[in-house]
């Protein structure tokens, strides 16, 4: 199999976690396990020409987690997708990050730049994670980071 491919993923959930921010979980036992921290996926949106690039937030047990912010028509359509739908995704894309054993990492991100840090934090040993958000209504994934260590 290639390093990446276009395949159908089953939409397990697509929930709003903050104002205009959604947490989409899609299942594909073949492609999801290939994702590395720092990679992204291209999500096909019906009636739109271009796919939407979304950072990989996490990948576990054949489930790819994509956290995205509604910014235009394409991501608005994505936010309306329902559990059980089939989602056309090209993944995993990008080189990802190389995490070296025995090193401590400091991960810094803000807003919608925070989601790809979660998968990275889970791969690191005792990472220092610093996040920032415009206001309290946009704070996301803090419990997930605590669980990651």
Annotate the PLM regions.
Residues 2-83:
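Ferredoxin-reductase
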Residues 73-149:
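FNR/FR-type flavoprotein reductase catalytic core
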């Amino acid at each position: 199999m290639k390093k990446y491919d276009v395949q159908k993923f089953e939409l397990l959930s697509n929930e709003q976690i903050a104002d205009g921010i959604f947490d989409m979980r899609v299942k594909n036992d073949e492609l999801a396990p290939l994702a590395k921290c720092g990679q992204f996926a291209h999500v096909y949106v019906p009636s739109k020409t271009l796919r939407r690039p979304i950072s990989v937030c996490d990948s576990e047990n054949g489930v790819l987690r994509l956290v995205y912010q509604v910014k235009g028509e394409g991501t608005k359509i994505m936010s309306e997708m329902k559990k059980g739908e089939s989602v056309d995704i090209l993944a995993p894309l990008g080189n990802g990050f190389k995490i070296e054993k025995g090193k401590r990492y400091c991960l810094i991100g803000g807003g919608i730049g925070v989601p790809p840090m979660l998968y990275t934090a889970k791969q690191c040993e005792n990472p220092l994670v610093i996040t920032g958000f415009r206001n309290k209504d946009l704070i996301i994934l803090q419990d997930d980071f605590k669980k990651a260590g």
